[in-house]
Amino acid sequence: APSLGFHGVR
């Protein structure tokens, strides 16, 4: 999973 940290995908 992508470590974006804003979509809740963290």
Curated annotation (Swiss-Prot):
Q: Which InterPro entries match?
A: Lem_TRP
Question: Does the entry feature the keyword Chloroplast, yes or no?
Answer: no
Q: Which GO terms describe its biological process?
A: neuropeptide signaling pathway
Can you name this protein?
Locustatachykinin-4
Write out the entry's keywords from A to Z. Answer: Amidation, Neuropeptide, Secreted
Q: Which Pfam families match?
A: Lem_TRP
Q: Where found?
A: Secreted
One cellular component (GO) term of this entry: extracellular region
Function comment: Myoactive peptide. Stimulates the contraction of the oviduct and foregut.
- Answer yes or no on keyword Secreted: yes
Q: Which of the residues bear the PTM Arginine amide?
A: R10
Q: Which residues cross the membrane?
A: none
